[in-house]
C-alpha cells in the first residue's frame, strides 16, 4: 500500500539492511549489486500478485518476473540477465503461469512473457 511504503522502508533500514526507497535508474545501477542482499521498497501496482508471509504482504515471484522485464528501474537486469532469472525461477519455484500471464497482460508485455515461457517450460 502506498501509505505504508515509507514506514516499511524505515522498518527495513532499522534492521540494518541495505534498503532503497523507490530508487531511480542511476541509484539502481550505481548502488544495488546482485551479489549483496538489498531491499527495494516501492509502491505496488494495483492488482499486483502478492502473498501474505508472516502477516506481511510481499510480491509473488510472478510479479517480480514481469516487473524485471518492463520496469525501467530494473533496466540493468534486462537482457541476458533477465532470461537467466526467468529460467532459474521456472527451475526452482512453483510459478503460476496463469497469474504470470494475467499480470504481464496488465503491464502490456504478455507476448514477451509468452515467448519466454515457450523457451523454459
PLM ranges: what are they?
Residues 1-17:
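Internal, conserved structured core segments that host functional sites
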